[in-house]
Amino acid sequence: MLVAGLFASGCGGGDAPSKAEFGASADKVCKDAEHALTGIQKPKSAADAAQAVDKVIDATQGSLDDLKDLDRPDGAAGDAADKFIASQESEIQKGIPALEKLRDALKSKDQQAMVKAEAELRAIDTTDTNALARAAGAKGCAD
C-alpha cells in the first residue's frame, strides 16, 4: 500500500521536483502511514498488543523507506528535504528499539518493562522533525 503511493508520486522525467511537489509526495507517504497505523485493530489481549506493535514497527519502517526513496528538489529546498528525512530517520531509529522492548514486555507480561518502554517512546522529541517537515514543504508530516 505504501509502495503504491511511492510509485504514484515519484516516477517521471529526469527533473528534480519542486519544493511543493516534494512536500505533496512526502505528505502522501505520511498520510498513507497514518492510515495504516489507524487501521490497526485495538488489541484485546497482551498477545494482540504485541502483534499490533509489530505492525506499527513495519508501517513505521515502511514509511521511512518510502520517504528516503522520494526524489529531492535541487538547492536549498533539497537540503531542507534531506534534513527532514534525516531527522525522521533518527527519531525512528530511537523509536523502533523502544517499540521492540514494548512488544517483548507485552509478550512476557512484564509490567515494569512496559512502563519503561512507554517512557522511552514518550521521551522522543519530535519538535525538530516537525519544524524540518514544515521547512521542507511537508506540512502534513508535521505533528
Spell out what each predicted region is.
Residues 1-3:
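Sec-dependent N-terminal signal peptides
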Residues 7-10:
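C-terminal motif of bacterial Sec signal peptides marking the signal peptidase cleavage site
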Residues 12-14:
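Bacterial signal peptide processing site
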Residues 21-108, 112-141:
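Alpha-helical segments in soluble extracytoplasmic regions
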